[in-house]
């Protein structure tokens, strides 16, 4: 399962997706397991995270990244700088 990351996506793309209308999620510096029951697309407003999929290689996600996490993926999040992101499931 692959995490898709678009670094500094075009503002027009973010507008097309309606990112500003998505809810916001925030998390302090921490480490925790997570499982995606459905796909999630999110846009990082702040933060620095290492996401390590079960059986996979760590991926770094930072402010300005548009990320899609696949359905069915289990992983560990290591929040290195507090996160603030818009998100959408499905």
Regions found by a protein language model. Name each.
Residues 55-71:
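Short acidic-glycine-tyrosine-enriched beta hairpin
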Residues 34, 51, 85-87:
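Short hydrophobic/aromatic-rich beta-strand segments that constitute the beta-sheet cores
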Residues 36-51:
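Short, conserved beta-strand element in jelly-roll/cupin
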Residues 17, 32-36, 53, 59-60, ...:
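Short histidine-centered beta-strand/loop micro-motifs
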Residues 1-3, 9, 23, 84-90:
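Double-stranded beta-helix
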């Amino acid at each position: 399962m692959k995490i898709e990351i678009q670094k500094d996506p075009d503002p027009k793309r973010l507008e097309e997706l309606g990112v500003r209308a998505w809810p916001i999620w925030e998390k302090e510096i921490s480490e925790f397991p997570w499982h995606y029951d459905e796909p999630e697309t999110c846009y990082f407003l702040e933060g620095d995270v290492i996401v390590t999929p079960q059986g996979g290689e760590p991926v770094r996600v930072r402010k300005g990244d548009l990320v899609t996490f696949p359905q069915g993926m289990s992983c560990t999040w290591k929040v290195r700088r507090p996160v603030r992101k818009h998100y959408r499931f499905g």
